Amino acid sequence: MKKFTLYLILVLFSFNLFAGERPLTTADRLDIIDVINNYGLAVDNKDYDLFRSLFFNDVEARLVFDPSFFGGEEIIINGLDKWVAYIKESGALFKTSQHLIGNPLISHDGELVKVRSNLNSRGYYKGEEGRSVSLWGYYETYMQKDKDSWKITKHTFFSLGADE
């Protein structure tokens, strides 16, 4: 009887721990992956309206470069307007770019959803025929559901290497 009572208490306690956390549906996961894919598409196509639609206004963006690119600099940008301005300014250096973002690992982190995804990106500089840069690393992206859509609240890029 003691074992049964203990087992029952443990089961009820574990249900209570997860009562507030709604599991992600397949539709949620697909929508989250679409946000990540649209991020790459928006940057590559210089579609700043699409880019803006993916984020909350108070987004925090962080770029952590390894020593082979930007000398290992870390950049922190707070707010959507500043983030869009940074992306426009850095995108202006390139004629074209292509972001290949894959292997999204989606998990709950408290109230937020965390997505870790790998990046391999190549950009071709404007006015410098044949000159390009390849950059690889990974993103840690935090999202929340805003009404019916997922939006990014925090986005961090960790550079693992670059080749010019």
Describe the residue ranges of each PLM region.
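A solvent-exposed, acidic/Ser-Thr-rich amphipathic alpha-helical stretch
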Residues: 48-109, 113-119
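Cleavable N-terminal signal peptides
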Residues: 7, 17-18
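Short, low-complexity N-terminal intrinsically disordered segments enriched in polar/charged residues
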Residues: 19-57
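Positively charged n-region of N-terminal signal peptides that target proteins for export
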Residues: 1-4
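A beta-strand edge to alpha-helix "cap/lid" segment located at domain peripheries
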Residues: 20, 92-164
